[in-house]
Structures are given as C-alpha cells and as structure tokens.
C-alpha cells in the first residue's frame, strides 16, 4: 500500500479529490429532502478528502495522521488508512449508524478500472442508481386521500375550489341584512326629493288602505290569496313605518349588498324624516314579488283593463294550484344533480343557515372547475338513471310548465314582458319631464305598485257603487 502511494502520489491524490467531490455534490442535491424527513435514513459521507493535503508538499506522517483522525471521527470500518483510502458510506438512522458501502471494497472496484473516465462513469452510474431509488421513494410516499370528513373545519377548503369566490359568499352570508335595510332607507330618502307629490300629501294612502268599503269589497270579491296579501300589506305598513321612524338614516351607502339575517338594533332619533308621510307599500325585502302582486296572472286569466290605465286584469281567475299531482313523474337526474346531491348535504351540514341560492352558486362554480375525467362517473350514472327511468315509465313525455301570462288591453302578455313594458314606459315618462333625474329601480317599483293599488281601489269603488245603485 505504501509503495503504490510513493510511486504515484499526485495521481492518487487527484483521483481521491475528484471522487470525494462527486460524492459530495450528489449529497448536496439531496440535503433539503433529508432535512425535511428526519426519520428517513441519511447517508453520511466524510468530507476529509477535500482537506487532505498534497503529499508532494506536506510530510507523509502529517497526511496519515489527518486521514486516520478523520476516519475515526466517522466510525469508519476500513482496515487501512491513507491518502488513497475511501471513506465508508454510512446511513444515519434513529437507531444509529450502519455501513452501506465499505470504503476498501469501493476502492478495489474503482481501482479495477484502468482509465480515469471509466472511474468517473462508474461513480456516476452509482449516483444515478441512488437518485432513482430516491425518486421512487418520493413517488411512493404520496399521501393517500382519505374520505372527506363531514366537519365544518374541513369544509372551508372545499368551498374555495372553482372560479367563483366562495369566501366572499360566506362573508356576505355571515354579515346578513344590515346594509340592505340601510340601502332601502337611503333610497327612500332620495325618493322624497325626486317624488315630492307622492310623499307630501298628493295621494292619501291612509284613506285608501283604511277604507272600510274597500276592505269589505276586497274580502267579498277577491280570491283568498290576493285578499290575504292585501290585508298583510295593510298590517305591515304601520309596523314598518314605526320601525323606520327609529332607524338611523344613511346618506350614502357604498358597501355591497349583504345577505345577512341579523337585524340592526334601532337607534332613537328625535325627528325622523320618514315620520311625515305614509308609504304605500311594505319595507320588507319581498315587495314587488311575483307571488304577491301577480297571483291573479295565470294561463287562464281573462278580463278587461281599467279605462285610462294600463294594468293587470281586474277579473281574476282561480290561481293555478301549487301542489303537484300524486301521479306526477319526476325527470331523471342529470350528471350535475347526481354530483350536487351529496355535496349540497355536506355544505348544509357545515353551514345550516346558508341560503340555497349561495349553495347553488358554489356548486355550479365547482362543477365548472372540474375536469372531464372527474365528471365522467357522474355522466355514466346519468345514463344509467335515464335508461332505468325509460324502463319504468315507457310512456313518459316531458311537458314543460306553461309560462305565466297577464291580459293587458285584451292581449296575453308574459309577466316578464309586462315588467319590461312598464319599465320602458316609466323611463320615457321620466325622460320627458324637465328637472327630474333618472329614477332608480326602487322608485320605478314604487310607482308601479302605486298604479296597481290605484287600479284596485278605483275598480272596487266602481263595483260598490254599481251594487248600491242596483
């Protein structure tokens, strides 16, 4: 061993340095993964090869002492020491160190190759094999996805999927109706400036709503749903006005609409601007809804409009029954409905107070964000349900529900078209009047409701006068 070291010391030192550098470079590439996983066995490569002095420029005894001390520090099991000795490749685990590659055996294998390039290729192949083992372990350690736990804490990441901003919906759902009430009050204050005749005594709504003749006529002639709606309207006006008198007025509201159900605590005000007039409609959020003001509109509606006004029909047919027939056959579920059935239950369990419209938006956003491969099982379930439905009901034919219509000036018009016509006429009317700004949607709804109440009042007064004359 000493003869070979003396014969060509420079060459052995250079080869040892190159070998140590290559092994250390491979170790540095894997340092981050080894530090992140302390339980994984790590390979320890002693770094004394770089620090080994050149034998040509230093005494032989010093080099042997440095080499032997370094090997002893790393608990090497090699039998010999020296410049050309290779360190043992150790694996550090929680149970201690173990030798993976013996330094003497590694030296013999490398020295069996004659050329320098062959030795480098041999070491590169060893490093490549270790790298492939590391990649295989990394791929095998991917976490197995457990079933989704129906826990409110685990539902939040699910709601963030898709293009839709689910976090904003949840935030709006938590804050609720406070700013919506403020927007209504602020718009009503603006309406007092643009509609002075409407709120300053131009129309006596109290006399209209508290008229006993009108109330008796309504109770006797109108169908039960419309009569009950009007009576509820009369009762809610006084209660809402009393509550509105104690509400704090807001000049300008720039925050977005909230879907919260929490009502703000009323603040006492000495003189409220709303206390000087009567409102012809309720301040609830369901004013102008189709279910209350258009119950008289049905496919079988018929009648004549009031002279001089364009309004809904006065002679009302029986409303369409809402209850479905016991023999009604439901349509088979499509792929989205199959997928959303279980997802909707999970969201409702986590957020019981969330509105159904917000849940539908979240589910629709997540469904759009899913890939075709993720949707494929649900499309297969849709095909299976469709075939099963066809076998169970071979004579089934889908018949869509007819559109709701109203009779205006002897013509059948859909409810949505009627709303569009009324809005267009009001826009033209306000545009011709000088000194008035463009009305808001709230003002347009208010004017439309006033016309409906006036039509009902005028018609029932005429009916009462005719009955009295007879």
Curated annotation (Swiss-Prot):
Impact upon substituting residue 364 to E: In rp26; egg laying defective phenotype
Transmembrane segments: none
Record localization: Nucleus
Biased composition (Low complexity): 60-79
Pfam families: HMG_box
Cellular component terms (Gene Ontology): nucleus
Functional description taken from the UniProt entry: Probable transcription factor that is required for uterine and neuronal cell fate decisions. Controls genes required for the specification and differentiation of O(2) and CO(2)-sensing neurons and for maintaining URX sensory neuronal cell fate.
Protein name as it appears in the record: Transcription factor egl-13
Native organism: Caenorhabditis elegans
Taxonomic path: Eukaryota, Metazoa, Ecdysozoa, Nematoda, Chromadorea
Gene: egl-13
